[in-house]
Amino acid sequence: MMKIEPIVGRYAHIDNHRIYFEEAGQGIPLLCLHTAGSDGRQYRGVLNDPMVTKDFRVIAFDMPWHGKSSPPAGWHKEDYRLTTGSYTEMIMGFARALGLERPVVMGCSIGGRIVLDLALKHATELRALIGLQTGAYVERYYDAAWLDHPEVHGGRACGAVAYGLMSPLSPAPEVWETVWHYMQGGPGVFTGDLYFYQVEGDIRGRIGEIDTKVCPLYCLTGEYDYSASPRDTEAAVARIPGAKFTVMKGLGHFPMSENPEAFLGYLRPVLDEIRQRERS
């Protein structure tokens, strides 16, 4: 029996990039940011949830170099490296190009980090921010260079790293699909994203300036994650007055893809609160 999902995929030409994105639903824009080295497929569970899409227009885009968004012309002339500036510009440029009015932005891992920068620099343009697996900084606990070593199968290595970050309680089919997304990544892309995550994107000295009265901040962190642990998120939130923090039991570093149904049980109440704020 055939089943057609309600998700629609499109390409948007923005500056010198051809960006692929998927969307479903209508209402408040909910812009979803994937993790390092992966792509927007991670949010298919959210895109397919009628309880979310009845009130929210869910949009997940692939960053350039990721998924179905190819790198720009001339990409072969230099190594890919994600920075705070390029990441922020990419997100806000995409939102403006699509004409999204004060979207909610939800990001995981590197996306969970960049929402803190968005809270500092673009709070008035956003309705709310949701950080998944958020930490103000992650110490380098391994040398990421070997992920792009010519004697290492980069796809298998990246998949192995991703596997170790997931909960042992997550369903096997979803776990292995998440691993597959990582195994498909382009050479050097995961490493380039980790440059932001582990080197350049340290925001510890500025998070105390975030004003949640301007833009509410919600942080949800899976308990089975040694990269951005609940302790890391708690330490960040403790310095941001008004930020809300929840530990997601039984989930790991990729909650939206490794166990979508369990993750939605935590996400829906947050979205309901955001929606109720709009009505008050």
What kind of feature is each model-predicted range?
Residues E223-A228:
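Acidic catalytic loop of the alpha/beta-hydrolase fold
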Residues M1-L31, V52-F56, L100-E101, R268-S280:
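Alpha/beta-hydrolase fold catalytic core
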Residues A243-S280:
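Catalytic active-site module of serine/aspartate enzymes centered on a nucleophile-bearing elbow/loop
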Residues R140-Y141, G155-T212:
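Conserved alpha/beta-hydrolase catalytic His-Asp/Glu region
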Residues H17-A73:
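Conserved HGGG/HGGXW glycine-rich cap/lid loop of the alpha/beta-hydrolase fold
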Residues L116-A157:
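Flexible "cap/lid" loop of the alpha/beta hydrolase fold
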Residues I59-M106, G265:
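Active-site loop/oxyanion-hole signature of alpha/beta-hydrolase fold enzymes
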Residues K213, C219-T221:
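Short beta-strand/loop motif that positions the catalytic acidic residue
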